[in-house]
């Protein structure tokens, strides 16, 4: 596999996907510190919002320490070369949120839907293109759909005006062959000028391998996070990705040592717990469960005595997807009742 001479855009997730393990409680000072470090390291694109995107502040997803407006207006003026992106999930974020982000200086908007529901993105993608934004269609939980199905969804988003399509391994479930099959099919179906991206999670330790597989079949935008800070076992660790790319001759424009220092000196100290592949994060990848479900499952374990691993396996069996966070507690309660019927003791917290 020779990828020498290829150029990719590394897109940072530390300040957006990294909000999940922080329970959306990053301070403005932490945002400023990490963002300026990433900018100085040469990272060209940095995503900044609530973990669930613009408008994510809610009972269902969690209330952040600050509003999206505060985070964006704090970070954007400090950037010397990096551009700032925002995530938007139709049904959570609105056109008004999109306009707010544009007015604050967000250059890239990523409109995210479940991998079978691209049709709900039409209004937001069309509006973003009308405003002249770099507009990305972001197909989540892509392991749950065939390559042929993803092609149809990607073509819809491209037709609405998206100039880049992302195939997103939200559960960290895919293996390199899965990535190649899906992304190569989508790459062949899209217009040559439409860019292709990949967003990975490290639940099966496949973040780097999957990202390289994506580049091999034509992806030129790759998501990663410093020290892997993100949902589950985290995103593809950026400092490792950049070092591997340097070894392989893939051009990222990111300084190998500066991004290591950002990860080690700025991101690791702000972690509330180590981002690693523990048994529950591994279960996310093994069972194909949405990454941000992890902390919800751990909280349900503490409350109802149902092991998080067993709960995650059940959520995977039921095919739960992002947006169904409220069903995690419901599923835990159902499992408690079923066990009590069978005479099993379940320790429910008062």
UniProtKB/Swiss-Prot annotation:
The record places the site described as Transition state stabilizer at 16
List, in alphabetical order, the GO biological process terms annotated in this UniProt record: catabolic process; L-leucine biosynthetic process
Spell out the Gene3D superfamilies in the cross-references.
Answer: 1.10.8.60, Aldolase class I
Q: What positions does the entry give for Mn(2+) binding?
A: 17, 199, 201
Quote the CDD domains the UniProt record gives: DRE_TIM_HOA
Q: Where does substrate bind?
A: 16-17, 170, 199, 290
Indicate yes or no for the key word Ribosomal protein: no
Where are the bilayer-spanning segments? none
Family assignment from sequence similarity: Belongs to the 4-hydroxy-2-oxovalerate aldolase family.
Question: What protein is this chain from?
Answer: 4-hydroxy-2-oxovalerate aldolase 2
Protein species of origin: Comamonas testosteroni
What is the gene called?
tesG
């Amino acid at each position: 596999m020779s990828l020498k001479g290829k150029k990719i855009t590394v897109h940072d997730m530390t300040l957006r996907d990294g909000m999940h393990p922080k329970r959306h409680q990053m301070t403005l000072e932490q945002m400023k510190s990490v963002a300026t470090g990433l900018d100085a390291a040469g990272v060209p694109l940095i995503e900044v919002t609530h973990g669930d995107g613009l408008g994510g502040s809610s009972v269902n997803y969690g209330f952040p320490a600050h509003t999206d407006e505060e985070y964006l207006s704090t970070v954007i003026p400090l950037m010397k070369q990096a551009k700032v992106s925002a995530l938007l999930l139709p049904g959570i974020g609105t056109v008004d949120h999109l306009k707010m982000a544009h007015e604050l200086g967000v250059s890239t908007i990523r409109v995210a839907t479940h991998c079978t529901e691209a049709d709900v993105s039409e209004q937001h993608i069309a509006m973003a293109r009308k405003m002249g934004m770099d507009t990305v269609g972001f197909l989540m939980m892509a392991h749950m759909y065939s390559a042929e199905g993803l092609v149809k969804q990607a073509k819809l988003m491209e037709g609405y005006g998206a100039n880049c399509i992302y195939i997103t391994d939200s559960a960290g479930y895919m293996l390199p062959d899965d990535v190649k099959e899906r992304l190569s099919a989508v790459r062949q179906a899209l217009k040559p000028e439409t860019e292709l991206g990949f967003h990975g999670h490290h639940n099966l330790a496949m973040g780097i391998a999957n990202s390289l597989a994506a580049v091999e079949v034509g992806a030129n935008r790759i998501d990663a996070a410093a020290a892997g800070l993100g949902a589950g076992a985290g995103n593809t660790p950026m400092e490792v990705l950049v070092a591997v790319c340097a070894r392989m001759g893939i051009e990222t424009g990111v300084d190998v040592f500066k991004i290591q220092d950002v990860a080690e000196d700025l991101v690791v100290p702000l972690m509330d717990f180590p981002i690693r592949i523990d048994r529950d994060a591994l279960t996310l990848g093994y069972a194909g469960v949405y990454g941000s479900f992890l902390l919800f499952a751990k909280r349900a374990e503490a409350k109802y005595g149902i092991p998080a691993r067993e709960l995650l396996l059940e959520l995977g069996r039921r095919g739960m997807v992002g947006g169904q966070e409220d069903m995690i507690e419901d599923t835990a309660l159902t499992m408690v009742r079923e066990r009590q019927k069978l005479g099993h003791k379940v320790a429910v917290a008062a």
